[in-house]
C-alpha cells in the first residue's frame, strides 16, 4: 500500500452512511456524530448503542443507492457486505472505511486525541488497530494537560504575525521560542 495522506475532513452537516449494526459500528457512529456528520445507519439489526446513538436507522440490508449524496461511508458489517459496500463506494468515488479490511478501504479512521483545540491522529494504515489504540494512549499521556494555554498563545502570536506581515520562514523559530518560554515559565511556577 502506498503512503497514506493524513487528512482532516469537515463532515459537519454532510451525509455519512454507516453500514452495520454491531459494537464496532457503534464506535464508528460515535466518531461520525462527534464530527457533526449527518449519519444514516443501514443494518437489519442494531445493537443498543446504535439504537441510542441518535442517527436515523434503515433496518434492512444495504443497497448501493444508500450511498447517494454521501461524502463518506463506513462499512462495519460482515466481510461480504463490507466488500459490496466498498465496491459501490468505489464506483461512486466516495471514500470508504472498510472495517478489518484495509485492502478494500480508501479511508481509515485513526486513533484520535482531542484536547482544547488540538487534535492528534494516529494511524497504522488499518493494519494494526490495537497498536493504534496503544499509541493513542501513550501520546495522550505525553501531551501537556494545559495544552489549551499553548493553543491560545500560538493563536495570539499567529494573529499578530499576520497583522505585522512577519514572513512565513521566520514564524516557526519564533513560535518555538515563544512556546519554549511558556513551557519554562510554567515549570518554574510548578516547582517548589
Show where each model-derived region lies.
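A short, aliphatic-rich alpha-helical micro-motif
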Residues: 11, 66-68
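Hydrophobic, well-ordered beta-alpha structural blocks that scaffold small-molecule cofactor pockets
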Residues: 1-45, 50-53, 57-60
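Residue-level detector of alpha-helix initiation sites
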Residues: 23-24, 80, 126
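ADP-ribose/adenylate-binding Rossmann-like module
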Residues: 72-77, 82-109
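Short basic, glycine-rich beta-strand/loop surfaces that mediate nucleic-acid
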Residues: 71-77, 107-126
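An accessory alpha-helical subdomain
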Residues: 126-192
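Short, ordered loop/turn segments at secondary-structure junctions
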Residues: 44-46, 62, 100-104, 125-126
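A structured beta-alpha segment of the ubiquitous adenosine-cofactor-binding alpha/beta core
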Residues: 60-66, 79
